[in-house]
């Protein structure tokens, strides 16, 4: 009987080590670098519009309009933002006030760009297609294309809260 009890105890301890552990934050940065052709398209847009922006290592460009003073969000942070997204032709494809997201669940350009500011900060991101929606058309509820494939995305984002 002691042998069976000992075996059961051993097996329960052994198998408990196989249980799924809390993996922490499931999100990660993909370390994607946009191709030079996409970077050149952004540079051409910036030049044509007399804009100055800082290059990120991913070949995205950004302007910190207000750095903020609060917390910097991590990938698993809940963020509250006001934003407007436009195309290089000036068409606004989306805007929201008080939008709530988990940073890590968003497009790569946002995962890389939003942590460049703190709570209360404002940033403008010039996101190449590779860090945005890539070669896919984005459609609205009616099926109309609101973001054509391979579009550069321009986002004006204010980080109002980090949770």
Residue ranges and their predicted role:
Residues 1-18:
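Sec-dependent bacterial lipoprotein signal peptides
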């Amino acid at each position: 009987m002691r042998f069976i009890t000992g075996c059961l105890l051993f097996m329960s301890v052994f198998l408990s080590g196989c249980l799924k552990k809390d993996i922490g934050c499931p999100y990660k940065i993909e370390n994607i670098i946009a191709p030079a052709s996409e970077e050149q398209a952004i540079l051409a847009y910036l030049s044509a519009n007399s804009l100055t922006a800082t290059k990120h290592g991913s070949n995205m460009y950004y302007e910190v309009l207000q750095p903020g003073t609060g917390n910097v969000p991590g990938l698993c942070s809940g963020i509250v933002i006001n934003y407007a997204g436009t195309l290089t032709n000036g068409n606004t494809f989306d805007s929201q006030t008080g939008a709530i997201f988990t940073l890590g669940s968003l497009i790569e350009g946002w995962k890389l760009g939003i942590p460049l500011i703190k709570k209360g900060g404002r940033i403008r991101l010039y996101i190449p297609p590779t860090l945005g929606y890539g070669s896919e058309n984005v459609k609205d509820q009616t099926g109309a294309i609101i973001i054509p494939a391979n579009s550069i995305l321009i986002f004006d984002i204010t980080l109002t809260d980090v949770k």
